[in-house]
């Protein structure tokens, strides 16, 4: 039918299961490799100020926030490299193929955040803020996520304000 896709089913582990039962080094290397590959496609930089402003107009900054829109806008990096990107690089969108014993990225999207930099920020909502395991607590999981987050800290623009921007889009 039009506007539908037929995708192969991949027998897999989701990242929650993988992280709990496997060594974290293979996943860390995979994520680092994905980001490095995306970064290698950088062509030029653009100023994202107008895109930030547009996105922030949709957020209701009430008294529950410790800063206002202008403060956040002033802290965000403006000139960002344009590159290939996933668009929704979260741990929920990485599977471990049991057949191929390797990782598979799923569900890429097009977005105005057209840089690997925003993929890092989205990934950090899972690594630093534990979004994908928000309904459970596991110290073992937390320590493994911290290892991956530490590896991502080697990339430029590993920025907490970009992380805040990504979190604002999913707040209730």
Language model: regions and residue ranges:
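Conserved short submotifs of the Hanks-type protein kinase catalytic core
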Residues: 2-14
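Short catalytic/ligand-binding loop motif for oxyanion handling, primarily in non-cytosolic enzymes
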Residues: 14-17, 93, 112-114, 131-133
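Active-site activation/catalytic loop segments of kinase-like enzymes and analogous catalytic loops
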Residues: 113, 117-155, 164-172
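Long, hydrophobic, amphipathic alpha-helical segments used as structural scaffolds
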Residues: 1, 39-46, 131, 135
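Conserved kinase catalytic-core helix
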Residues: 15-85, 160
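Histidine-centered active-site/metal-ligand motif
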Residues: 7, 39, 86, 90
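Short, flexible helix/strand-to-coil boundary loops that buttress conserved ligand/catalytic motifs
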Residues: 19, 109, 127
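Active-site acidic catalytic loop and adjacent metal/ATP-binding pocket
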Residues: 71-118
């Amino acid at each position: 039918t039009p506007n539908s896709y037929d995708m192969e089913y991949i027998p897999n582990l989701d990242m929650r299961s993988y992280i709990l039962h496997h060594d974290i080094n293979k996943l860390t290397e995979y994520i680092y490799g994905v980001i490095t590959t995306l970064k290698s496609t950088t062509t030029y930089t653009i100023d994202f100020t107008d895109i930030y402003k547009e996105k922030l107009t949709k957020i209701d900054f009430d008294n529950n926030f410790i800063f206002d829109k202008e403060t956040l806008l002033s802290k965000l990096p403006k000139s960002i490299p344009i590159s290939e990107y996933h668009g929704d690089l979260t741990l929920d969108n990485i599977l471990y193929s049991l057949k191929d014993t390797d990782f598979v990225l799923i569900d890429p999207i097009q977005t105005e955040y057209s840089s690997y930099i925003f993929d890092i920020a989205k990934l950090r909502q899972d690594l630093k803020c534990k979004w994908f395991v928000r309904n459970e607590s596991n110290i073992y999981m937390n320590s493994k996520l911290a290892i991956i987050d530490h590896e991502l800290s080697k990339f430029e623009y590993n920025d907490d304000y970009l992380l805040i921007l990504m979190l604002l889009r999913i707040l209730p």
